[in-house]
Amino acid sequence: MPLTVKCPICKAPVEWVPQSAFKPFCSERCKLIDLGDWASEKHVIPVKAEFDPEAFDEFDLDEGDFFKE
């Protein structure tokens, strides 16, 4: 008996077999809805922001230095 999972979008049952063209989704519609959610940033992968202010020190120029020749 094949494994059955729920479609992440509509919760319909999906058999996890090679013939399931859209797995883990039940249909192309649900697959495209999920793609749209990623594209519109409704889904994001959490990443710890690592801001290193020293990495930008080389770009810190005094305004007077900017226009010197």
Swiss-Prot record:
Q: How is the cofactor bound?
A: Binds 1 zinc ion.
Key words of the record: Metal-binding, Zinc
Q: Any keyword Metal-binding?
A: yes
Keyword Chloroplast: yes or no?
no
Q: Which GO terms describe its biological process?
A: regulation of DNA-templated transcription
Q: Which residues bind Zn(2+)?
A: 7, 10, 26, 30
Quick one: signal sequence residues? Answer: none
> Which one of the record's GO molecular function terms can you name?
zinc ion binding
Kindly list the cofactors needed.
Zn(2+)
**Which portions of this protein are annotated as coiled-coil regions?**
none
Summary of the function given for this chain in its UniProt record: Inhibits all the catalytic activities of DNA gyrase by preventing its interaction with DNA. Acts by binding directly to the C-terminal domain of GyrB, which probably disrupts DNA binding by the gyrase.
Q: Which family does it belong to?
A: Belongs to the DNA gyrase inhibitor YacG family.
Xref: PANTHER family: DNA GYRASE INHIBITOR YACG
Tell me the subunit arrangement. Answer: Interacts with GyrB.
What protein am I looking at? Answer: DNA gyrase inhibitor YacG
Give the organism the record lists. Shewanella baltica (strain OS155 / ATCC BAA-1091)
